[in-house]
Amino acid sequence: MKERKFFGTDGIRGKVGSGQMTPELALKLGWAAGRVLSRSGTKKVIIGKDTRISGYMFESALEAGLSAAGLNVMLMGPMPTPAVAYLTRTFRAEAGVVISASHNPYYDNGIKFFSTDGSKLDDNLELEIEAELEKPLVCVESHLLGKVSRIEDARGRYIEYCKGNFPAEHTLTGLKIVVDCAHGATYHIAPAVFRELGAEVIAIGDKPNGMNINDKVGATSMGKICETVLAESADLGIALDGDGDRIMMVNSKGEVIDGDQILYILACDAKSRGVLRGGVVGTLMSNLGLDLALQALDIPFARSKVGDRYVMELLKELDWRIGGENSGHILNLDHGTTGDGIIAGILVLAAMRRQNATLEELTSAMEMLPQVLVNVRFEGEHDPLKSDKVKAVQAQVESQLGLRGRVLLRKSGTEPLIRVMVEGDDHSAVLAHANLIADAVKSAS
C-alpha cells in the first residue's frame, strides 16, 4: 500500500498551529474529503469535537471545506468520539468527523474520519483524500454549495443510546459513583447517563474551559479520582479521557482497575451468560495476568499490536467480539463499532448487578503480575534490537522467568526510544531484569 503523507494510524494529529494542524490544512482537508465522499451516498457529513479551544477554529474550517465541495454538514458541538460514530450510523451520513487529540494536552488537536457504518475510515479512502489534497481547491458553483445545520438533540440521543445498553431489569439505585470526565467531551453526558440509571453521581473533571482537558484528571491521571472515591466513601469510580473512548475504573478501596481487568470482567460475564463468541483480544502490552486468568476459564486469548485499530483488525479476523488495551480502549462489537468509555462502564456495572458483586469481587480471581516498563533513548540509524548482546540478555531473562513471566522489546513509533517491558511474579526481580536488558540496549546504542 502507498505510504500515507498526512493520515496516521488514528487520523491527523499534532500541535495546533504547526505542522499539519493548521486552519489552512483543515479547510483543504474538508474540501478534499468532500470531493471523495461526494462520489457516492447521501452527501451528508457529521462533525463532532471535544472541548479544546482550537476545536471551534477547526470546526469552522472543516465545515467550510466540506460545503465548498458540495456536502451538507451537520454539527454536533462537543460530543464524545463514540457518539460521533453512533450518530453517523443513525443519520445514515456518508461520514463522521471528529476533532480531537484524545488524551493529549489542550494545545494538541487532531482530525479523524468515520465511515458510514461508524467504523474507522478505510485506508484506501484516506489515500484518495490525500491525492485530492495535492490538487488546487476549486469551489462548486453557488447552487451546489453544501448547507450547514446543527443536530440540536445529539446529547439526548446519545444518552438514551448509552442507557439502552444497560439491562432493563436492573438499576444502579444504591450505588455511589465518582465520574471523572477529564474536562472533556463527556462532561455533559456521562454524569447524566449514570444518574438516570439510578446512581448517586459525584462528577469531577466536568468544567471544561477549553484549556484544561486531561489536565491532572481523566483516565490518564488517576490520582484525583482515587482520592475522591476514598473521601466520598464511593462504591467505585469511572474515569474517562478527553474524547470519551477510553476508560479506567477505581474500586471502593481506591485501587485502579485498568483495561485488562475490565476485559476480564466483560469476558467472565459474557461466558456466564453463554454469549461469549470466541475469546478476547488484548495487545502485546496486556498483562500476563489477564492471559493466565482467561486460560483458567478456558477462554482463548490473542494479542495484537499496540493500538485499538489493530485490536479491531484482529477481532474481525477471528470473528470475536471483546477486545481492548490495558490503557482503557475497550471494544465490544455487540455494543458498538469503536471504543466507548461510557458503554464499557455500563457493561461492567451490568455485570456487577447481574452477579450482585462488587468491583473488587469481580476482579479477585485475576492476579495482575508486576510489570515494569523502561524507556531507553538511542541515537543514530542503527537498531539496538538487532544487537547480539541484547538478544542474549533477553534470552537469559526469559529463561529465568519461565512460563510466569514475559519480556517485550519494541521500538516507539514516534520517538527514538526502545521500550523494555518485563513481567513476572516478583516486582524486585522484574525491575532488576528490566534494568539488565535496558543496560544492554544502552550499550548497543
From Swiss-Prot:
Signal peptide: none
UniProt-listed Enzyme Commission number(s): 5.4.2.10
Modification Phosphoserine, positions: 102
Lineage top rank: taxon: Bacteria
Residues bound to Mg(2+): 102, 241, 243, 245
Stored CDD domains: GlmM
Annotated SUPFAM superfamilies: Phosphoglucomutase, C-terminal domain (SSF55957), Phosphoglucomutase, first 3 domains (SSF53738)
Cofactors (names): Mg(2+)
Post-translational modification: Activated by phosphorylation.
Catalysis performed (reactions): alpha-D-glucosamine 1-phosphate = D-glucosamine 6-phosphate
Active site: 102
A single Gene Ontology CC term: cytosol
Keywords assigned: Isomerase, Magnesium, Metal-binding, Phosphoprotein
Major enzyme class: isomerase
Cited function: Catalyzes the conversion of glucosamine-6-phosphate to glucosamine-1-phosphate.
Family: Belongs to the phosphohexose mutase family.
HAMAP family assigned to the protein according to its UniProt record, in alphabetical order: GlmM_B
Identification of the protein by name: Phosphoglucosamine mutase
Organism: Shewanella sp. (strain W3-18-1)
